Swiss-Prot record:
HAMAP family found in the cross-reference section: NDH1_NuoI (MF_01351)
Protein name: NADH-quinone oxidoreductase subunit I
Gene name of this polypeptide: nuoI
Catalytic activity reported: a quinone + NADH + 5 H(+)(in) = a quinol + NAD(+) + 4 H(+)(out)
Topological relation to the membrane, as annotated: Peripheral membrane protein
Length: 171
């Protein structure tokens, strides 16, 4: 008898409670500030692509969904010849964003990645590259790291410290 009354109480309590279901197309779900969604490639403040094709993102990816090939520009700047992410394999873990030294890879709160054909989930560089700078608007990797200047060794450019000889520091 007690179990039947308890069951009736639970049914009545849940009958008049508010449902947790969100009617998705009409109501947007609440996304938290650190939500990790679709991956994008950003540009630096000069409008150039930030990615220097260092391959750290592909090396750290646990499911191996990132592929890229490095090439060099005429002024010595590295950039990816192709950059490909297979979103059918991506688990949106964010390790690629953490590993990127240039802040080129950033995760956005966009979560609508469904397609009818799985081949459409392979995004090329043209699909990933956005026009803005993303989360870090003033950062430019080449202003921080510099570029090699033809005819000058390390430490000979303007406002550049000479390289440290680590062998002289050894005991």
């Amino acid at each position: 008898m007690i179990s039947q009354l308890r069951t009736l109480w639970i049914v009545l309590k849940h009958t008049f409670s508010r449902a947790d279901t969100v009617q998705y197309p009409e109501q947007r779900p609440k996304l938290y500030p650190r939500y990790r969604g679709r991956i994008v490639l950003t540009r630096d403040p000069d409008g150039e692509e930030r990615c220097v094709a260092c391959n750290l993102c592909a090396a750290v990816c646990p499911v191996d969904c990132i592929a890229l090939q490095k090439t060099e520009d005429v002024d010595g700047r590295w950039y990816p010849e192709f950059f490909r992410i297979n979103f059918s394999r991506c688990i949106l873990c964010g390790l690629c964003e953490e590993a990127c030294p240039t802040y080129a890879i950033q995760l956005t709160p966009d979560f609508e990645l469904c397609e009818y054909d799985r081949r459409n989930l392979v995004y090329e560089k043209e699909h990933l590259l956005i026009q803005g700078t993303g989360k870090y608007p003033g950062y430019s990797f080449y202003r921080v790291a510099g570029k090699a200047i033809a005819g000058k060794d390390k430490g000979q450019a303007e406002n550049e410290a000479p390289p440290i000889d680590v062998h002289s520091l050894l005991p």
